Amino acid sequence: MASNQKTIYVYESFRSTEPNFLGTLFVENVRGRESYSFEYDADWLKSSANYMYLDPDLQLYAGRQYPTGAKNVFGLFADSSPDRWGRLLMTRRERILAEQEGRKPRKLLDSDFLLGVYDETRMGAIRFKLDKDGPFLSDDSKTPTPPWTSLRTLEEASRQFENDESGLEQKWINQLIKPGSSLGGARPKATVLDTKGNLWIAKFPSKHDDVNVGAWEKVTHDLARLCGLDVPESMLIDFSKYGSTFLVRRFDRNGAARIHFASAMTMLGKTDGASAADGSSYLELVSFIKANGAAPKRDLTELWKRIVFNMAVSNTDDHMRNHGFILKADGWHLSPLYDVNPVPEGDELSLCVNEDDATISLDLALEIAPYCEISTKDATAMAADVLKTVRDNWNRLAAECGLSRSAQEYMRPAFSLALE
């Protein structure tokens, strides 16, 4: 039986700007199928005896540990891996390299995708090496993170790639791979640096768009801000006739310092695709915050308001990957809101609101308010405020984002709860 093992050295940069050796990830490859195990570094365990766990499958003790259930890889490392867009780009890059080197393209495995993300822009604060004395992977000093001024060219490159994967030059493939994020699905995107050295994610128009997705994401993003929800800085720029580019500042960085991010999928021990269909619920997020949150009262209120807001804008893609947590010195906090888009035909959320119902219904949201330690009186007032804010501002914000009256009428059903 053909078998070989890859040893990956794992570091974290969330306790200080200097990386700390976290442990060793072992990848066993048997006939093209990979299995994973991980072992914490003994010194890291000693210095982190009272530290929050990073993954429910990785308890704070010595010895090898393995993913549980149907999971092939630990969620901690899945969050550091590229999304579908990133995988498409890496697969294309491998074909280009194979052609240049006169060989057949390799089939890329999960560990190849994990190590293929650029360290400089990798999501969160987990980092990887194949040699303890070597560079953090992936390293690419020849292709630095593109500046803000390259956005127009990057949008054009993303459009070329969507239209013809085989026609894009390697240098642009490398630039588009830069996001290094497990967030965002297959949407074309790139990471860019602003003039102050801050990382931003640029989400470009896609040939598959039926509406101006970037503009509508900006509308809902600004509505969330007006509702008092925690959202990162954002902006909207039009570079072409194909739609708007939505830019959002990365919340996993504070200057040069990395902030560890974990998806709710990881922290709740879920697998990709977990949804209301299998009983995945907001109540599980509530339980996690109560048990592990550094600021549970604040985060429970924020989470509940997000549920109402998701209903108010019909954000039906609110699955476990689209909720997350960031790790600070005092523990886990609900991350800023991200990936919120209105859906005109939406009538159910991706997650159950209570144990078994995902219906967009204010009564359902009010039903679980006590679990979030919010009184019925306060919940009713907060919900009314969210709905009024959406009702009074969605048209105005849509117009400011360049969306026509017909585009607004098309999207109007997404705001039905607020307009009732």
What spans do the regions from the language model cover?
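Phosphate/dinucleotide-binding and metal-coordinating scaffold of catalytic cores
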Residues: 1-320, 324-420
